[in-house]
Structure formats: structure tokens, C-alpha cells
Amino acid sequence: MGDLLYRRSPNAYYKSSTALKKLVAKLYLEIGEANFGEDYDIVLGGGFLQTRSPYDLDAGQVTYSDLMMLFPFDNDLMLCSVSGYNLKRKFIETTNSNYYVAYSTYGASIKDNIDDNATYYILVDSYTAQYKPNKLTVIKQYTSGIYARDLLADYIKRGGME
């Protein structure tokens, strides 16, 4: 659990809680596009994302334990459908400061012209998917047991924090 993932280079930098949540939303989107994008036009990835204490990631060595402290919950990733009306209200125009999203190229091109009655596809975690007020329908689950912290660990191993 405490295995060193990556010793950051001298120019690596601190990541704030906000930056981490934006990055996780982007990683959700990448997973969605890579695994479901051939069959679905995915608008965005993200949802309700919140880090836990210590909230931020300091420059220096990063272990899996560090990431587990930041993102401790075992929320699987889900491809969901949502009406245009709820997509706008709950994700695009939300006033909830805990919702973070990353738009696909397709999503960025249509986000200002969403049809309330159309169906759209998004990639979120199981917490966001199962939160009833979001009114999402789960279409498919990504590999069980892959969580936000795992996506961050893979990103770091690939040199994404340099």
C-alpha cells in the first residue's frame, strides 16, 4: 500500500484539491471515451468529487497510501444516460461546488445547445450514479474495483505529474 509510485522531478509541483478533482474528472472522461466511446457519444466525465484530508498533494514522493487518503471511497465507474434537462441542471449549469466535469470534444461542442428531451451519455462514479436526484440510468459499469485513486496512480506512473 505504501509503495512508492513516483519520485517527482525537481520541476514537479503541488496539486491543490481543486486541481486533483479536475484531473479525476478528466481521467473519468478518458476511461469513458476509451471503453465506451465507440458506441456512445460521451458528453462528459466527472460528477460529485471530493478529496479528504490532507485534501492536497504535496510535491515530492507519492505513494498509493497518499492517494487512498485523498480518495478513500470505493466508487466504481459507470456509463450513464441522462436527459438533456437533467444534464444541464445537475452537471453543466450546476451551482454545486462539489461537481467537477471534463468535457469531451463532442460535449464541448454541444454543451450550450443541449436539447432538454434528448438522451446524453456521461461517465461518473457509482456515488454520483446512484444519487437519486441526478436521475441517471446506469448503462454499463467499467471494470469493478478501479477507483479514482487507481486512475491517479496510473496517471502518475505514466509520468503525468511531471
Residue ranges of model-derived segments:
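Feature captures C-terminal
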Residues: T18, K22-E162
